[in-house]
Structure formats: C-alpha cells, structure tokens
C-alpha cells in the first residue's frame, strides 16, 4: 500500500490532463545534465528560479549577460511557456516590456521523479522551480526487471494524473547499480537486474522523455542545482565530495559546478576496509557496506538481542526508536556505525582533499545523536585542516530530490532544446 509522504497536490495552472501515453515515433532517452549550465537561456531560467519575480536589468546584473541577450532569452522562454510576466508588479511609471518583472511559469507543468531503492521506490511530482508537489512510496517490485519497471511506470503514471491541470514534461529515474546514461540501461546486482531497460520502459509507460542517473551522482547534483545554498553559485574550480550512506554507501565528486560521471559508471566504496569483524558476501570481513548498511546494523542488533526476534524482520525505525527512548545498547550500536562512517569520510576526504564535503542519507539524518560521534571520529582520523563539512540540507528527503533533479536537469541545462523534445 502506497504511503503519501508530503503535501497533497495543489491543483493550479492550465495545462491539459495527464492522459494515457500516446504513440511516439521514437523514445526520448536523454542523458541527464548534472551540472550548472553556462548557456544564456539556462542562466536566465536559473536566476528566475532563485530571484523571481525580477526585471530584465536585474537579471542582466545577476547573470553577467547583456540586456540585449537577456531580452532575447526572456522572449524565447516566454514563447515556450517556461516564464511568465507579472504586469501587476510593474513599477509605477515604468514604460515598455523590459520593465515588466518575470518569473518561472511553474503552475502549468510538472516533472516526475522516480527513486528506485532496494526496498522502497519513491515517486515524486515537482514543479519547474524544483519544489516537490507531492510524493508517494511503494514497495520496490521483486522479480524480473521488465515486470518490476512496468509496475513502477504504472504507479508513476497514476500518481502524476492527480495533478490533472498540469502537463508532465519529463521523467527522471535515480537508482543504484551501474547506469548507462546514454541508453538508460542499468545493472543492479542488489535487485538482480542485468541490462535492465530502465529508460525505455519508463519512457514507454509514461509517454515522456526520460533521463536515468546513478543515485549518488544525482544527490550531488541536487546540491548544485536545487539546494538554497546553490543560489550563490560555485566558485571557479571548486571541488566537492558527496558521501551517502543508508542501505548502501557511495560517493560522488563535483568539479567546477559539474558532477563527475565516469563513462564506465560510478566507482564503488562498498568494500572499503573498516577493520570491523562483519562478514561480507564477498568472503572478506570488515567491508564498508557489510558494516554500516541498514541491513547490517539490523542484523547486528538482532544478534545482540537489542531487537526482538519476530516473524517480520525489524526495521531501522525500531532501532532508532529504541535508542531515542533510552536504550543504551541501541545507542551504542548506532554510535559504532557513526564512528565507522566518520573514519571512512576522513579517509576519503584526505584522499581527494575537496573544498567541501556533504554528508547525505538516513545513516546521518535519522539519528541526530550520532552526528557528534561522526564528527569526532572524522577529526581524529583526518590529517588535513578542516574545511566545509556539513549534513545535506535535504535531510531525510535526499532520495526525493535526487530523482527530482534528474527529471529537471535537462530543462535547466537547455530549456529551449528540452521543450522541443517534449513536443516531438
């Protein structure tokens, strides 16, 4: 049974009802643009998102573009329906359209984000500002990838149809495993998927252009494109390390406003040694995921008698609740996890020496009492001067914003080209 996690849909705007997908001459599987684009149309749309409503002269100052260039881009984006003018906000005595403020025309449209987790799949509807309109969680279907993805697409289509006045523009899928962004094909060992046609099946099921990305890379992109902190931009040459931990662990690197996306797919930190005695499926002991994943922590809690045996496997929520309610053994097992995470982040930070480090995922955000232990272990293990290290501002919603940014990244990077794809 699906469980809504955010606010109920806002029924605004004037776009046509989301209908059963019509036949298309070809599928649009488009690699995501996990970067801050320097194109003029992208720059104008970005400043409209962050500062709108605003005038053209303010937009020119904010983007560094000439007034003439801003006028051309605003006119093009107005014609495409991505911007709207606010004549009601025109200063008294102002003459001519250049004085009329403009903003993102967010009410007629939505995008569909899908985060496919090992256990739960989240489906998210967002507007063009990157604001989440609503979200729903469904169990990730088990079995053959084609059947599972068809079911996910069906659920996503039904969910998006709740906003009957909004026109869906794009779908974005974020998930673990090895992702070929060009083709939308994914290998996901945890789900048993080999050459899963993620892009093709979701595009067919929704009748929309679709982009597919590795989920940790997408989380890093959400910090660049959707975080309030991103409004000030990224310093030239600035580097970042994004570290994620929950059921899996992973990292992504950002360089100069762009997520580094290796052509052969993201690397893995699953088997980094931690020194623990946890048995890994690879045959070794002490591998990172075998030590800190939700599944590993629950198993350790069961072995220690912290959580009761039952017909249904306990959840992390039960462990967090026990620790928050004063269970010293539950707290201790979460502290041990926090210490391993802190040491691992320190090792990676010393290796890459980025300008900033962002920690994301429920392993950090679900148990705030563990954060001081992450920080202490990090400080003890790192040999470099401390810089900007923080927890993601998206909190427990990092998965939602990861898929949201995949659904929006191409529109943000090339608004004109993206809108042409949506109408072809």
Where in the sequence are the language-model features?
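ATP-binding/phosphotransfer module of carbohydrate and carboxylate kinases, centering on a glycine-rich
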Residues: 1-89, 93-153, 157-158, 228-235, ...
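Glycine-rich phosphate-binding loop and adjoining helix at the ATP-binding site
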Residues: 132-239, 369-379
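Short clusters of small/polar residues that mark proteolytic maturation junctions
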Residues: 88, 137, 191, 264-265
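Short glycine-aspartate micro-motif
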Residues: 101, 111-115, 168-172, 240-244, ...
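Short secondary-structure boundary segments
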Residues: 175, 245-247, 294, 361-362
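Glycine-rich phosphate-binding loop of actin/hexokinase-like ATP-binding domains
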Residues: 236-291
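Short, acidic, Ser/Thr-enriched surface-loop or helix-capping motifs
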Residues: 127, 181, 254
